[in-house]
Amino acid sequence: MRDLPPTVFIVDDDEQIRRSCEALVRHAGLRSEQYSSAHAFLEAYDTARPGCLVLDVRMPDMSGLQLQQELNRRGAVIPVIFITGVAEVPEAVEAMQHGAFDFLQKPISAQGLLDRLHRALAFDAATRASLLERRKMQARFDSLTDREREILSLVLEGLSNKEAAARMKLSARTVEIHRASLLRKVGARNTAHLVRMAMELRAPGTEL
């Protein structure tokens, strides 16, 4: 999915708004998909698809805020740009507090929307690249043996090879070998780098 070009998803019950946004997106050379309701979008959307979401705050059946909350529940990282009327600014503020990327007041400014779309798409690409790297890092930690995990836990306690060896009733040389294997497997440059990586991941099997 990450190799797919980004898509601008437009969700609004107002057909005229959808058409206007679609024309603007197409003119900018971007892909788009339009949905007349939050439910229709949820049925079609795969969270692995890159892009951004242009979303009306108030819609019948399921509001934009409710859709945002459902996407958060599903772990979606797609940036959301809310479209609001003057009377809907409080809802837009609430949306921002729940992680919305930005909001745009009606009547929609073409340049304002384009600027937000480009920033949102760049943000989405950076976020997905970061998540991909994190998954790769997690996979490296998951490949550790039970002994390496035990040593990792002691490293995070700040124990030296000699102290870890005494705790584990092993020779310092054996601990040194396992520690070197641990660093190599996870791709850590040194012990300080290893600790930073483990703290970032809160890796399973470590007592953080």
Spans of features found by a protein language model:
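Non-catalytic signal-transmission and effector/linker regions of two-component phosphorelay proteins
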Residues: 1-9, 15, 22, 37, ...
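C-terminal output helix
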Residues: 88-90, 104-117, 163, 167
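Active-site beta3 strand of CheY-like receiver
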Residues: 9, 48-54
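Active-site residues of response regulator receiver
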Residues: 56, 84
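Receiver (REC) domain active-site loop signature in two-component systems and cognate sites
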Residues: 59
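Basic, Lys/Arg-enriched C-terminal extension of HTH/homeodomain DNA-binding domains
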Residues: 183-208
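Acidic catalytic/metal-coordinating carboxylates
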Residues: 36-37, 63-69
